[in-house]
Amino acid sequence: MARTDDDSWDLASSVGATATMVAAQRALASHVPNPLINDPYAEPLVRAVGIEYFTKLASGAFDPEQMAGLVQLGITADGMANGMASRTWYYDTAFESSTAAGVRQAVILASGLDTRAYRLTWPAGTTVYELDQPEVITFKTDTLAELGASPSAERRTVAIDLREDWPAALQAAGFDPEQPTVWSAEGLLIYLPPEAQDRLFASITELSAPGSRLVCEQVPGLETADFSKARELTRQFAGETLDLDLESLVYTQERQMAADWLAEHGWTVITEENDELYARLNLDPPNPLLRSIFPNIVYVDATLG
């Protein structure tokens, strides 16, 4: 089903299901030998959502015949894990280095099943704000409480759709725009129309004191992405057990790249292509088939002032 301006979702449907997919990939990345990341909450959260395929993915419980077919395509469990492991590491490192430098406000936009407020080690006095749909926030908070998990920073949730007046809601939750902030928009931008992406950046800029930092990704050439290959891989992975069509969820219209917009509005920008990040982390290059679906993802690390 195509996106609309007022669509909504939970963690088992539409855009929300992609948050569950990401958590399943984080769980898989946490299970491989010598993992780059460790998210102990990802698998139980995915199990609680209850999508069969993602539950299997999170536990690494692949059907042998299914896995054999993927191996013929050059896709391995480690290879599937590397993409999310490297992305998660990139954002984890941004939060850790920012707070080590003295930043004490962190904002996670479209937080989904992100558990950084629980699994990272935060300096005393750090407040982590999480923004997402009310159902998503409630589900994650309640499930983690049932697991006996406690945040490792002061965690404040802002249950709001980013199409609403989230800057006002964030400030009502105690956010101080006079203090430097580290922001993340992880895996978010492709789910926004171009004009909404620009509004998001404008709001972040308005709320950011000098020294604030924003990390996100951009996908050059999204308008030419081959979604037919993505659908075929979904069938290969999950058969008929997963109804998730990425093409219907993302906005493929041409847009200004995040790095360019931010550079034009007072941010100092560093970019790193996905292939470069893999090399820096000594990971095998991305599988060519997976790589052919999307052009190279570019990570953006921007500092204001």
UniProtKB/Swiss-Prot annotation:
Signal peptide: none annotated. Transmembrane segments: none annotated. Its EC number is 2.1.1.-. S-adenosyl-L-methionine binds at D132, D161, L162. InterPro entries: Ppm1/Ppm2/Tcmp (IPR007213), SAM-dependent_MTases_sf (IPR029063), SAM_mthyl_Trfase_ML2640-like (IPR011610). It is an enzyme of class 2 (transferase). GO terms for biological process: methylation. GO terms for molecular function: methyltransferase activity. Keywords: Methyltransferase, S-adenosyl-L-methionine, Transferase. SUPFAM superfamilies: S-adenosyl-L-methionine-dependent methyltransferases. It comes from the Bacteria. Exhibits S-adenosyl-L-methionine-dependent methyltransferase activity. Belongs to the UPF0677 family. This is Putative S-adenosyl-L-methionine-dependent methyltransferase MAB_3787. It comes from Mycobacteroides abscessus (strain ATCC 19977 / DSM 44196 / CCUG 20993 / CIP 104536 / JCM 13569 / NCTC 13031 / TMC 1543 / L948). The lineage of its organism: Bacteria, Bacillati, Actinomycetota, Actinomycetes, Mycobacteriales.
